[in-house]
């Protein structure tokens, strides 16, 4: 193969690889799984709830999240943030309700799978956490923070609990 053809082929491979690697990033952007991640929405109640969560004021964040939920009851991200806030307040039943609703709406929701897994660990159910780790493994083709965080939490749990 001549040098110009080889260079052209290498360029094509690099472009294809770059496109292939950008697909998971584009897909992940739709899933607002972290309470600290900036939302694409301009909803002032959701923005205020996120600020409150970042400052650990979970109780007050609930007020704003419930307002958003009234307007958008099928928003998996809002259910995830409600579950997160309730979990941080040790209100386990309410946390499960909202995590499960987020997962009903969007079974592959990264944050809800991570956080419900962490909640299962808190309740001494590592096998249930492993189920959600498997979902994250399937969803995160090239790895993601949610998978890494839950995997580490399971590892820590097993180290401390045999």
Locations of regions flagged by a protein language model:
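Alpha-helical segment of the N-proximal tetratricopeptide repeat
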Residues: 40-71
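Residue-level recognition of tetratricopeptide repeat
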Residues: 41, 75, 109, 143-144
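Structural marker of alpha-solenoid helical repeat scaffolds
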Residues: 71, 105, 138-142
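Canonical tetratricopeptide repeat
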Residues: 81, 115, 149-153
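TPR/TPR-like (Sel1-like) alpha-helical repeat modules
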Residues: 118-145
């Amino acid at each position: 193969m001549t040098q110009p053809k080889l260079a052209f082929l290498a360029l094509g491979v690099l472009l294809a690889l770059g496109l292939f690697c950008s697909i998971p990033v584009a897909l992940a952007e739709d899933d607002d799984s972290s309470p600290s991640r900036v939302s694409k929405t301009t909803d002032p109640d959701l923005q205020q709830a996120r600020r409150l969560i970042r400052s650990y004021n979970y109780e007050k964040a609930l007020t704003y999240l419930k307002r958003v939920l009234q307007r958008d009851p099928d928003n998996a991200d809002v259910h995830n943030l409600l579950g997160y806030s309730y979990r941080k307040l040790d209100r386990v039943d309410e946390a499960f309700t909202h995590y499960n609703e987020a997962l009903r709406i969007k079974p592959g929701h990264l944050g809800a799978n991570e956080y419900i897994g962490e909640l299962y660990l808190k309740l001494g159910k590592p096998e249930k956490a492993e189920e959600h780790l498997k979902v994250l493994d399937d969803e995160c083709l090239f790895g993601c923070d949610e998978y890494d965080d839950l995997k580490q939490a399971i590892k820590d749990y097993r180290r401390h609990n045999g």
